[in-house]
Amino acid sequence: MEDNQEILDTMIMAYRIAEDKNVLLPINVCFDGFYLSHMSERVEIPTQEQVDEFLPKYVPEHIILDPQRPMAVDPLTNGNLLTEYRLKHMMGQQNALKLLEELDKVYGEKFGRSYGGAVEEYRCDDADYVIVTMGSMTGVAKDRVDKARADGKKVGLLKMRMVRPFPCDRVAKVLSGKRAFGVVDRNVSFGWNTGIIYEEICASMNRAASFVPNVPFIAGLGGEDITATHIDYAIDKIIAQDAKTGKHDTVWLNREVMGL
């Protein structure tokens, strides 16, 4: 989530997704601690009547706590049932992805705010280069994309809004055909020595049989700031990667910008 308004709106959508009869799964709305969780920010709050109209009353059908309808919820599952459960979990997640794309448009029509569904595309249509972000860093990144555009650099931004299930088809559609892209992760995947979202995106591109020169970035660990200077540095690295083939070594933004 980029800001507190998006958190509020997504939370409302999340209930409708989780309670849909074709999903029925727990859902997490994740956002940056302190940068958003402890920040005072003005938001527009829908009325209770508007929310009630958007969120139908939840009427459980599969599990009901009712002494007149006793049931046992399986405490131990054998292989056959577990396989069926996992299949249905996977199907429910894929349904959630489709539902988010649809609900985002419905929410936008009703409340005047929408966020692109599973991903948000910012100035990507004619971009040669794309920087991929997630969370609160996106605000400053959008500003720097605008600055790069003003300087004649055709840069766009792709913001990840959903991680599970991963919107691999949309990601590949946006990034395929670009001259280069970079992913700024606020995490580390030690097995790959890159960030987690970077590897998810590379897997999506591989599934689409599409290769685009790319750069993995890691920044902002432990709450360290990701500033305009860091994003400008990342954009320049992505553009420099254009003429090369293969992957770039992971760039630790906070260290490189400081000259460490």
Where are these regions (language model features)?
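Peripheral docking tails and interdomain loops at the edges
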Residues: 185-260
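Flexible, glycine/charged-enriched surface loops at secondary-structure junctions
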Residues: 21-30, 113-122, 155-156, 211-216, ...
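Conserved thiamine diphosphate
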Residues: 1-33, 210-224
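Short acidic, glycine/serine/threonine-rich loops at helix termini
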Residues: 9-13, 38-45, 144, 170, ...
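Conformationally flexible catalytic loops at phosphate/diphosphate-handling active centers
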Residues: 26-120
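Redox- and metal-dependent alpha/beta enzyme cores, enriched for Fe-S-associated oxidoreductases
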Residues: 125-153, 166-173
